[in-house]
UniProtKB/Swiss-Prot annotation:
<feature type="binding site">
    <location>
        <position position="240"/>
    </location>
    <ligand>
        <name>Ca(2+)</name>
    </ligand>
</feature>
<comment type="pathway">
    <text>Hormone biosynthesis; thyroid hormone biosynthesis.</text>
</comment>
<dbReference type="InterPro" id="IPR000436">
    <property type="entry name" value="Sushi_SCR_CCP_dom"/>
</dbReference>
<feature type="glycosylation site" description="N-linked (GlcNAc...) asparagine">
    <location>
        <position position="342"/>
    </location>
</feature>
<feature type="binding site">
    <location>
        <position position="325"/>
    </location>
    <ligand>
        <name>Ca(2+)</name>
    </ligand>
</feature>
<dbReference type="Pfam" id="PF03098">
    <property type="entry name" value="An_peroxidase"/>
</dbReference>
<feature type="binding site" description="covalent">
    <location>
        <position position="398"/>
    </location>
    <ligand>
        <name>heme b</name>
    </ligand>
</feature>
<keyword id="KW-0560">Oxidoreductase</keyword>
<feature type="site" description="Transition state stabilizer">
    <location>
        <position position="395"/>
    </location>
</feature>
<feature type="domain" description="Sushi">
    <location>
        <begin position="738"/>
        <end position="793"/>
    </location>
</feature>
<keyword id="KW-0472">Membrane</keyword>
<feature type="glycosylation site" description="N-linked (GlcNAc...) asparagine">
    <location>
        <position position="129"/>
    </location>
</feature>
<protein>
    <recommendedName>
        <fullName>Thyroid peroxidase</fullName>
        <ecNumber>1.11.1.8</ecNumber>
    </recommendedName>
</protein>
<dbReference type="GO" id="GO:0020037">
    <property type="term" value="F:heme binding"/>
</dbReference>
<dbReference type="InterPro" id="IPR037120">
    <property type="entry name" value="Haem_peroxidase_sf_animal"/>
</dbReference>
<keyword id="KW-0893">Thyroid hormones biosynthesis</keyword>
<feature type="disulfide bond">
    <location>
        <begin position="806"/>
        <end position="821"/>
    </location>
</feature>
């Protein structure tokens, strides 16, 4: 018994000793604090560091308004919407905090100890929570109403019931192969100048562009089969399924260096180094480049996620839904959707431009403040008056062809909505909106999978990698993959023509109608002032795309003049693509060939056969020196085409695999039984891109297949002969035979009708910024509705202390359905709409004070001047000869120099000395 007691006491003492030693060790590693306070302080310090870098970026951007440098335009095109920005900021705070834990651990110990060995799982989760990442890592709450099977959520969440985050916006891009970071976790390929691949350094991306990719504008070959619309649709549909935001900061987190100026790799700055025999504008030795934002719970944050290890690599975020769902039209977040809808309409319409019309048709609305005025102003107008267009994707104003497609689909939604309301007067505005949105999404799917992708892959590869539709498969993850978004689908950049062709009503060119691409970047005023959408559409239909030829990959409008609106610099799209692949840690070309079941290329002969061009193989191997080192985007781009295709075997495999996943993993795919009726599916299949153009533009003739280049007029058909949908398939009889009818409209909300167990059900929702008070759904019973409808009450976001809508630098003012962040003069609201920044100007009160002071000083000076001059005049008068005053006709009156009179040349020089003496000094008088 005594021995047991002694043993028990010994074990207790040992455990207590180990426990307190563990506490002391953790306290020491966190800089002397206990776990909780140490972690909280560390996260707060990381938040301050990240926010200061973001604040510095916004301050610099404000001071550069009106200076349209290419890097600034690129930044605007990659500007995330607020929900994505919040997720990106949280990921950066989280990663910065964990990097600091790692640094402290390594500094105090010789071993490469992991944060998971130092902090408890509870405190690791605390870091995720304090940084703001946790909400972006948890599964969303999915609705269980009868609408769950009728309409997709705007965020794409809950499409898959078992994996509700699959395909949702603001989640990580999928990885089909493990990434190849230089430290295994986060550092891009090419980050460390002395890091070797197969014993060799990677070539600078700018040198790859110059030697392999670049071709002059005059040397391009045109596609004899496909129209420029094929290229434009590829860009448009890419913007429907993928958007990887750049870091929210353009200043280094450590030290605040400006990423537009520094040539050092200091996250998030990852500049493109220029060859030693070349320099950029003003002698620059690099081009600016910013890393893509990490997704929450990846990279050095991986240790903080339950089932992930420390080695979980950095992932990149997709700010859009992965699905082909027309997010280009409707957005990918509730806040964005709210900005796009016309809430005063009973027809479920989208907002249109209220200042400009296109021959009676709608233009896209302008983006409201505080969006930066990044679009180029019309010549002769102030730079501050150059808003970009507002659409579901922030890149809608990049080039006229892209803007034209956004405009077409805005008009198509409103056309369908008006027709549906005319057919079904009993439909609520929300029902009309959702039904039109559902049809527009289906048309995006049809045009892409039926008409576009087979032309890109070729019939054989399409059958192999995509094949016929077999129905929805809940085991298929539809999430857009990193290699698809960052490499394979960027093949389209090699099909961009250096000219924007605009044609008149007879499809003829005229002087000044064509624009070099550099004169069209971010210039929406050209559509407003130079003929509207129709001339651009005619050019897309009747002029060929550029053909992707191995030794003519990208023209100089993209490699030398990307986003160039002035002489303030340049960017190179080819180098950006290569650098982005390295930033994302994409494995090399051979790894992806093996992934697709293709043979690895080991020799020059192998590469020469794959490209069908020995000269190109020479150039590539001359730079990379080993086939395994070739960047996947370049390798896939250089492959010779498959039969009837516009890609080689590698990109055909990756694009086909992705498109099949987008189709088979989408519960709301248009062909999935139950999404549409059989009659509706039949009508949808009759529609085409040509019909959309006929219905929403001034064109009276179009090709039957809008993606095949047509010769005017013999290969164009009148719009009357282009078949389309009969919307009668969407006619519904109004409910009858019950005691319910329809309730009164809900202010700041709406309702949708569906059936549940044979009973009519109304499901209510509120606009963004409002909260339901009352039941979310009511059911029709024999005695009427089982409950009165709910109310929509405004949410006071300013009371949210866990996730405040405004930065601490701003005052929060609640508004109906939203919030307004206000700044005290001289601070102004930054581009994020929540932070006050210094614009580098004096306060308005100071300006007024200075102006009043200047007036006072001038007044006093004038008074003093008057006194001096009167005194001078009085002293000088006795020196005048008697009888020679004014009006005697003998002598002109003498001027008083400097006292307000006009000096007459040659007047009484003998009296100058006396006048000077009486004034006191010539300087005073003058």
């Amino acid at each position: 018994m005594g021995a047991r007691a002694v043993l028990g006491v010994t074990l207790a003492v040992a455990c207590a000793g180990a426990f307190f030693a563990s506490i002391l060790r953790r306290k020491d590693l966190l800089g002397g604090d206990t776990e909780a306070s140490g972690v909280a302080g560390l996260v707060e310090a990381s938040r301050l560091l990240v926010d200061e870098a973001i604040h510095t970026t916004m301050r610099r951007n404000l001071r550069k308004r009106g200076i349209f440098s290419p890097s600034q335009l690129l930044s605007f095109s990659k500007l995330p919407e607020p929900t994505s920005r919040t997720a990106s900021r949280a990921a950066e705070i989280m990663e910065t905090a964990v990097q600091e834990v790692k640094r402290r651990v390594c500094r105090r110990r010789d071993t490469d100890q992991l944060p998971t060995d130092v902090l408890s799982e509870e405190l690791l989760s605390t870091i995720a929570n304090l940084s703001g990442c946790l909400p972006h890592m948890l599964p969303p709450s999915c609705p269980h109403t009868c609408l769950a099977n009728k309409y997709r959520l705007i965020t794409g969440a809950c499409n898959n019931r078992d994996h509700p985050r699959w395909g949702a916006s603001n989640t990580a891009l999928a990885r089909w192969l493990p990434p190849a970071y230089e430290d295994g976790v986060t550092e891009p390929r090419g980050w460390n100048p002395h890091f070797l691949y197969n014993g060799l350094p990677l070539p600078p991306v700018r040198e790859v562009t110059r030697q392999v990719i670049h071709v002059s504008n005059e040397a391009v070959t045109e596609d004899g089969q496909y129209s420029d619309l094929l290229m434009a649709w590829g860009q448009y549909i890419d913007h429907d399924i993928a958007f990887t935001p750049q870091s929210t900061s353009k200043a280094a987190f450590a030290g605040g260096a400006d990423c537009q100026l520094t040539c050092e790799n200091r996250s998030p700055c990852f500049p493109i180094q220029l060859p030693t025999n070349a320099s950029g504008a003003a002698g620059a030795t690099c081009l600016p480049f910013y890393r893509s934002s990490a997704a929450c719970g990846s990279g050095r944050q991986g240790a903080l996620v339950g089932n992930l290890s420390w080695a979980a690599p950095r992932q990149q975020m997709n700010g859009l839904t992965s699905f082909l769902d027309a997010s280009t039209v409707y957005g990918s977040s509730p806040a964005q959707e709210q900005r796009l809808r016309n809430w005063t309409s009973a027809e479920g319409l989208l907002r249109v431009n209220t200042r400009h019309r296109d021959a009676g048709r709608a233009f896209l609305p302008f983006a409201p403040p505080p969006a930066p005025p990044a679009c180029a102003p019309e010549p002769g107008t102030p730079a501050a008056r150059a808003p970009c267009f507002l659409a579901g994707d922030s890149r809608a104003s990049e080039v006229p062809g892209l803007t034209a497609l956004h405009t077409l689909w805005l008009r198509e939604h409103n056309r369908l909505a008006a027709a549906f309301k005319a057919l079904n007067a009993h439909w609520s505005a929300d029902t009309v909106y959702q039904e039109a949105r559902k049809v527009v999404g289906a048309l995006h799917q049809i045009v892409t999978l039926r008409d576009y992708v087979p032309k890109i892959l070729g019939a054989e590869a399409f059958g192999q990698h995509v094949g016929p539709y077999q129905g929805y498969d809940p085991a298929v993850d539809p999430t857009v993959s990193n290699v698809f978004s960052t490499a394979a689908f960027r093949f389209g950049h090699a099909t961009i023509h250096p000219l924007v062709r605009r044609l008149d009503a007879r499809f003829q060119e005229h002087p000044g109608s064509h624009l070099p691409l550099r004169a069209a970047f971010f210039q929406p005023w050209r559509l407003l002032r130079e003929g509207g959408v129709d001339p651009v559409l005619r050019g897309l239909l009747a002029r060929p795309a550029k053909l992707q030829v191995q030794d003519q990959l990208m023209n100089e409008e993209l490699t030398e003049r990307l986003f160039v609106l002035s002489n303030s610099g340049t960017l190179d799209l080819a180098s950006i693509n290569l650098q982005r692949g390295r930033d994302h840690g994409l494995p090399g070309y051979n790894e992806w060939r093996e992934f697709c079941g293709l043979s690895r290329l080991e020799t020059w002969a192998d590469l020469s056969a794959a490209t069908a061009n020995g000269r190109v193989a020479d150039r590539i191997l001359g730079l990379y020196q080993h086939p395994d080192n070739i960047d996947v985007w370049l390798g896939g781009l250089a492959e010779s085409f498959l039969p009837g295709a516009r890609t080689g075997p590698l990109f055909a495999c990756i694009i086909g695999k992705q498109m099949r996943a987008l189709r088979d993993g989408d519960r709301f795919w248009w062909e999935n039984p139950g999404v549409f009726t059989e009659a509706q599916r039949r009508e949808l299949s009759r529609h085409s891109m040509s019909r959309v153009i006929c219905d929403n533009s001034g064109l009276s003739h179009v090709p039957l297949d809008a993606f095949r280049v047509g010769q005017w007029p013999q290969e164009f058909e009148p719009c009357a002969s282009i078949q389309g949908m009969d919307l009668g398939a969407w006619r519904e009889a109004p409910p009858s035979g019950d005691a319910c009818g329809f309730p009164d409209p809900v202010e700041d909300g709406g309702f949708l009708l569906c059936e549940e167990r044979g009973q009519r059900v109304l499901v209510f929702s509120c606009r963004h910024g409002f909260r339901l008070r009352g039941p979310a759904q009511i059911t029709c019973t024999p005695r009427g509705w089982d409950s009165p409808p709910p109310l929509c009450k405004d949410i006071n976001e300013c009371e949210d202390e866990t996730d405040p809508p405004c930065h601490a630098s701003a005052r929060c003012k609640n508004t109906k359905g939203g919030v307004l962040c206000e700044c005290s003069d001289p601070l102004v609201l930054g581009e994020d709409g929540r932070t006050c920044v210094d614009a580098g100007r004096l306060p308005r009160a100071s300006v007024v004070s200075i102006a009043l002071g200047a007036v006072l000083v001038c007044g006093l000076a004038g008074l003093a001047w008057t006194v001096v001059c009167r005194w001078t005049h009085a002293d000088a008068r006795p020196l005048l000869p008697v009888g020679e005053g004014e009006g005697d006709g003998k002598s002109p009156s003498l001027p008083l120099p400097g006292c307000g009179n006009r000096r007459d040349v040659g007047a009484a020089p003998a009296l100058e000395v006396e006048q000077d003496l009486s004034c006191g000094s010539r300087g005073l008088c003058e």
